[in-house]
Structures are given as structure tokens and as C-alpha cells.
A protein has these predicted regions:
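Extracytoplasmic gate region of multi-pass secondary transporters
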Residues: 54-58, 257-305, 309, 371, ...
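Cytoplasmic membrane-interface "Motif A"-like loop-to-helix N-cap segments
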Residues: 95-106, 320-335
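Juxtamembrane intracellular "pre-TM" segments in multi-pass secondary transporters
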Residues: 11-30, 219-264
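Central cavity-lining transmembrane alpha-helices of secondary-active solute carriers
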Residues: 74-91, 302-315
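Cytoplasmic helix-loop-helix junction between adjacent transmembrane helices
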Residues: 129-167
Length: 667
């Protein structure tokens, strides 16, 4: 059955009128319907691109605006909470329409992303401006799936929703592609994040112009009815002439706050925790856990979102062909659960780039297989209660998913509290460690470094005067004896001829006159006698000192340093000697670098040790979310077996023909 499209825009003529009055009085032919669906998907992709663009440069934003990871996550959390109430406002589109909201939102967000947010120079300006954008996008991202539903009968609903769900994923994919191709491996400045926002905003303005010129929507009398196949078109247009819109829209939330709507919305929201974690933190996760550059982390996003897009569209086509949704949700949930467990176990290990790429691709395929049929089934469940309240049902879902994200992002910094040192300091610490390997050695030998710092003056002297230290070591006995017998040696040095003459005699044969002279030279009286006795008793030690007197004289200028060096424990000297090359290299590190490492290296090392386990815990929570989703599937409308679904479609077609016959008989 066919029908011609009458005046397409509610009887309005002229360019200006068409920019304001966008309602179609009759259901469009297939070509125009596909065009409007494609335009809605384009708007959705653009809105999500603008929403997610910060993820590609999140590490640069944190560093440039001096944000902690916790502050960043809390910002995202409250952004979603604010967007949740924007989503509730979007429920009014059941009464006032969708297209103008989408067009306004595209213009508003493009201006903010291109020109306002990039001018933020502190974290509070960035946050508040992001909140404003979040409210507008919360409204638009409920209006767009409502438009998708309006232009797609149930028989093609999964395919249409598959294309719509490509919106967030294609938005993520564009973020990753643009980021991996425009963000250098080593950005020249942390302010480079504004570059990505400028690109995104300019593209957004182009999409706004296209939508402003061409986007349309169905009139309320057309969209507020259930359409199973395109063959229902004539019946819908006939019924539209007598539909009571006010009655259909009375007490909308009371009509839809039911277990099948609410629990299903909660379930898919917790299933998508892993998706929103990837959107917000994939770059942070890959750079801090596996050490990838921002460029390579965005490259992994290409794999994740590219495969997700293919899965979303393919499963939509297959679900429509087989006429069932639930088996695909189960299959996708199981695949997602298994792959996510394998993926989370990689933390703390060293998987290759392509190992992670394949896991991300498979995980995204599983989520896509589950999500597209859920979107189709959810809108069909809402239609089963009241087809006039699609936007209200999607607003409830939009509110719930943003509240769930808000709560999860509040929880995330509690579970993962190790990211801030890695994001804020990890890059500099790693770069310094690569440039100065001795810093890495110092980190693994703290006691050696501490001892070297404690005795730095003594060890520095030893390193600068190795021959002096070697001589002092060689003549250590003589040096000790020189100090011990200093008075005796002073007397001998002052009276060399007298002691040379005395050396010709034994102590018992020295002439009395010579003995008297010796006693007088030694200080006279008992003092002189005692000193001579000491010389006589320690003749060998004193002779040893005299034998190397020239060598000891060369060491005399360093006596203070050698005395201080003698106070250093031998074990410290041994360790310093064994590690002299490393300590010498460490001494050449600029003081500013050493100070930075001293302030932050320990925190970075501790965080790096804790972070993999904390991320695993979070991903286990995400696994639980997918399992809860699997348990909720029976609540949704729809058959499990294709033959049962085909029978329902045949019965509906018979009803349509009967209704058309009645309308024809009464006209």
C-alpha cells in the first residue's frame, strides 16, 4: 500500500518558515525517511564527538589545568548528573517536538566547544563550561533516538537503532582517529588540548548548518502511534486525523514508571559502565598502566570503536531479519563478560599493542551485539505501553543512565586512588629516568644513596683525590703512629744530630753527658726521661714513621679530610667504591631534576605498584554490571524464537488490513 507525501512541512512555505516549522504532515517515502534517519545519526555522531573530545587529550588537560585525577572524575560525574536533568527535560519533546531542540543544541555546543571551552585557563572555568554543554547535550541525546524511532517501523527498528547507537561509538571513533593523527607523540605543550577542541567545534558548526537546513520531524498525530511495518503507513495517516493527543500525553511519567522500563534502563546503564570507562579513561588507563603514548592510546581506541560500529550495524540487520532481540542480547552479554575478564587480567603484565587491540575489538563486538537489540526492544517495550510517550521513555532512560554514570564516577576514585601521581608526575619521572638512568639505579639502592649523601663531603674528597686516599691507606699504620708519637717525633725532628749520635750506642752504653743532653732536649727532668723511655720502647714504630716521612709530609695538607674520611664506616666506603660509576653519574644529574625526583618518584613508584590491582577491581565491578544486564533481559517485550515473532507480525498485518477495511467502510 502506498501514499503520496503531501506538503512536507505543515503547510509552510519559504526558507525562513522551514527553519522554524519542521513538522511533516504525512509519513515520508522511503528515500526521504532514510535521509532524515541519516541526518539524525549525523547529528548524534557530532554531539557525542563534542561530548567525548576531551578523552583524547585527558592527560594534557589534567596537567595543563592542574587537575587531580579525582577532581577530573568528579567533574565528569557531576556533568552526567546535570545532563540527567537535561534528559528529563527532553521528555517534553513528546509534546513540543524534537527537531528544533536538536538544531539549537548543535549550534550551542559547537560554539562552546570551538571557542569557549578552549579559552579556559583553570580547572573551574573548564568544569563550569563543560556543565553547560552537558545540559544541552543531555536534552539533544534523548531527542535524537526519539527521531530515529519516529522514522523507523518496528520491523526495521533494530537496524535503525543500530545506526543510532553508532552515534556514540562513531563519536568515540572520530575522537580516537583525530587524536591519533593530530596529537604528536610528544606534544610541544600541555596546552595542545585546545587544538582538538577547535577542530571538533568547527566540524560541529558545519553539521549545525546541514541540520538547520534539512532536519524534519513527524507531526504529533503521526508519531504518537505504533508502526510495526511500512505497510502500516496508510493506517497511521488515517488514524492521525482523529487522534486525541492530549489524552495520550496525560500523566506521562506515571504511565511509564514500571518495572520493565525502569529495571531495564538500570540494567543497560550498568552494562555500559565498561563503555563509559573506556570513553573517559582509555587514554589514562593505557598511558599509566601499559606506558603507551597518548598517540598510541588513541590508536587503540580506533580498534575498539571501529569494530563496535560494525557490530552495531550488523547485529541490527540480523536482528530485524530474524525478528528477535533477546537471543542477541544474551550472546553479546556472554561475549562481553568473557572478554572483559581476559582484558582486566592483562593489568600488571606486559601485553603487546595488538594483544590489547584484539581484546578491545572483541569486547566492543560483544557490547554491540547486546546493545543494539536492547535499544530496539526498549523502544518497543515503551511503545507497548504508550507509543505517544517514546521521548518520555527515552528521557527516563537518559536520566537513569546519567545518574548511574554519576554514581559510578563518584565511586571510581574511591576504588582507583593511584592515578593522580601517574598522570601528573609519571610522564616527567619516566622522561627523567630515561635521560638519567642513574636515577633508576638510585631508586633501587636507597641505602647506598642515603649513605653517600650523608658522607658526601668525605666521599667526594676521596673520589677527587684517589692517589691521596691510596697513599693514606697504604701508610695508615705510619699515619696512626705519627699521630700517636707526635711529641716524640717532634723532639727527634728538632734534634736530628743528637739522636743520630745516640743511635750509635745501646741504651745502657750511652755516655752520661750525651744522656743528659738527650733528657734536656726532651724537656728535662722526669718529663724528658719519660719521653726518651717512650722512644726507646717504640723504636720500631717511630723508625717506620721516619722512614716514610716524605710521603707523610705530602699527606699533611689533607690531614683534616683524611681524619673525616677515617670516621666513615668501612662498609660505606666499600659500597661507594663498588658503585662509584653510578654515584658519579648521579652527581651529574641537574639539581632541579634530582629535587623533582625526590619529591615525586616515590609516589609514582607506589602508585604504579597499586594501580593495576585497583583497575582490576573496577573492571570486576563492570563485569557484575554485564551480568545484571543478562538477568534483566526477560523483562523486555519481544520473542525468543524467530517463528513466534513471525507469527506475531502476520497477526499484526491481518489487524492492519481489518482496520483499513473498517476505515474505508466508514469514510
Amino acid at each position: 500500500m502506498t501514499a503520496t507525501t503531501a506538503d512536507p512541512v505543515s503547510g509552510q512555505r519559504g526558507l525562513f518558515s522551514s527553519l522554524i516549522h519542521r513538522q511533516l504532515d504525512s509519513y515520508p517515502d522511503t528515500g526521504m525517511r532514510v535521509f532524515y534517519l541519516a541526518l539524525t545519526v549525523l547529528a548524534t555522531v557530532m554531539l557525542y564527538y563534542e561530548l567525548y573530545v576531551g578523552g583524547s587529550v585527558s592527560t594534557l588537560i589534567l596537567a595543563n589545568l592542574h587537575m587531580s585525577f579525582t577532581f577530573y572524575v568528579i567533574t565528569l560525574a557531576f556533568g552526567n548528573l546535570i545532563g540527567a536533568f537535561g534528559s528529563l527535560f527532553a521528555g517534553l519533546t513528546d509534546r513540543y517536538g524534537r527537531a528544533n531542540l536538536v538544531v539549537f543544541g548543535l549550534f550551542f555546543t559547537a560554539i562552546f566547544v570551538a571557542f569557549v571551552i578552549p579559552n579556559a585557563t583553570n580547572k573551574w572555568a573548564f568544569t563550569i563550561e563543560g556543565f553547560v554543554v552537558g545540559v544541552v547535550e543531555g536534552i539533544c541525546l534523548v531527542a535524537t533516538p526519539a527521531l530515529i524511532r519516529d522514522f523507523s517501523p518496528q520491523v526495521g527498528r533494530a537496524t535503525a537503532m543500530g545506526f543510532w547507537t553508532c552515534g556514540p561509538v562513531l563519536g568515540s571513533l572520530i575522537v580516537a582517529i583525530v587524536g591519533s593523527n593530530t596529537v604528536p607523540a610528544v606534544p610541544s605543550s600541555t596546552r595542545f588540548w585546545t587544538h582538538e577542541y577547535h577542530i571538533c567545534g568547527i566540524v560541529g558548526l558545519v553539521v549545525f548548518v546541514i541540520a538547520a537546513l534539512f532536519l524534519r520531524e513527524l507531526s504529533p498525530r503521526l508519531r504518537d502511534q505504533l508502526m510495526v511495518t511500512m505497510r502500516d503507513r496508510a493506517l497511521i495517516e488515517a488514524r492521525a486525523k482523529g487522534i486525541d493527543i492530549e489524552a495520550a500525553l496525560r500523566r506521562p511519567f506515571r504511565q511509564l514508571v514500571k518495572p520493565d522500563v525502569i529495571i531495564s534502563a538500570i540494567a543497560v546503564s550498568v552494562m555500559l559502565l565498561i563503555y563509559y570507562t573506556a570513553v573517559g579513561f582509555l587514554v589514562i588507563y593505557m598511558t599509566t598502566i601499559f606506558g603507551f603514548s597518548v598517540k598510541d592510546a588513541n590508536g587503540l581506541g580506533n580498534w575498539e570503536w571501529g569494530f563496535n560500529v560494525v557490530a552495531l550495524i550488523a547485529v541490527g540487520l540480523l536482528s530485524d531479519r530474524l525478528r528477535v532481540r533477546k537471543p542477541f542480547m544474551v550472546l553479546g552479554g556472554i561475549i562481553g563478560t568473557v572478554i572483559l575478564v581476559i582484558y582486566l587480567l592483562q593489568a600488571g603484565h606486559h601485553p603487546s599493542y595488538y594483544t590489547l587491540a584484539i581484546l578491545l575489538a572483541l569486547l566492543s563486538v560483544g557490547l554491540g551485539i547486546a546493545y543494539t537489540p536492547w535499544m530496539a526492544s526498549f523502544t518497543e517495550t515503551v511503545e507497548d505501553r504508550n507509543p505517544a510517550l517514546i521521548a518520555t521513555g527515552l528521557a527516563i532512560w537518559g536520566w537513569i543512565i546519567r545518574v548511574i554514570i554519576f554514581l559510578s564516577f563518584i565511586l571510581l576514585p574511591v576504588v582507583i586512588n593511584s592515578v593522580t601521581p601517574l598522570v601528573n608526575y609519571g610522564g616527567t619521572v619516566a622522561a627523567d629516568a630515561a635521560q638519567y638512568p642513574s636515577l633508576v639505579w638510585a631508586g633501587s639502592h636507597p641505602t647506598v644513596v642515603a649513605a653517600a649523601e650523608k658522607y658526601s663531603t668525605q666521599l667526594g674528597f676521596a673520589a677527587a683525590h684517589p692517589s691521596v686516599v691510596a697513599a693514606a691507606t697504604k701508610y695508615s699504620t705510619q699515619l696512626a703512629n705519627a699521630a700517636k708519637f707526635a711529641p716524640e717525633l717532634a723532639v727527634i725532628e728538632k734534634n736530628p744530630a743528637l739522636f743520630a749520635q745516640a743511635a750509635k750506642y745501646t741504651p745502657t752504653t750511652i755516655p752520661p753527658a750525651l744522656a743528659a743532653k738527650l733528657i734536656a732536649a726532651a724537656g728535662g727532668g722526669s718529663k724528658g726521661t719519660a719521653l726518651l723511655g717512650t722512644i726507646d720502647a717504640n723504636q720500631a714504630a717511630i723508625s717506620g714513621v721516619i722512614a716514610v716521612s716524605s710521603q707523610l709530609t705530602a699527606l699533611a695538607p689533607y690531614s683534616a679530610q683524611l681524619k673525616a674520611l677515617a670516621a666513615v664506616p668501612p662498609s660505606v666506603i666499600a659500597e661507594a667504591t663498588a658503585n662509584s660509576a653510578e654515584l658519579a653519574a648521579l652527581a651529574k644529574v641537574p639539581p632541579s631534576v634530582s629535587a623533582y625526583m625526590a619529591a615525586h618518584a616515590s609516589a609514582v613508584t607506589t602508585a604504579a605498584a597499586k594501580s593495576p590491582g585497583q583497575w582490576k577491581t573496577w573492571y570486576w565491578i563492570c563485569v557484575g554490571g554485564i551480568i545484571f544486564f543478562l538477568l534483566s533481559i526477560p523483562l523486555l517485550r519481544g520473542r525468543w524464537r524467530p517463528r513466534d515473532a513471525k507469527r506475531d507480525e502476520e497477526e499484526h498485518e491481518a489487524m492492519v488490513q481489518a482496520e483499513l477495511a473498517k476505515l474505508g467502510a466508514t469514510s
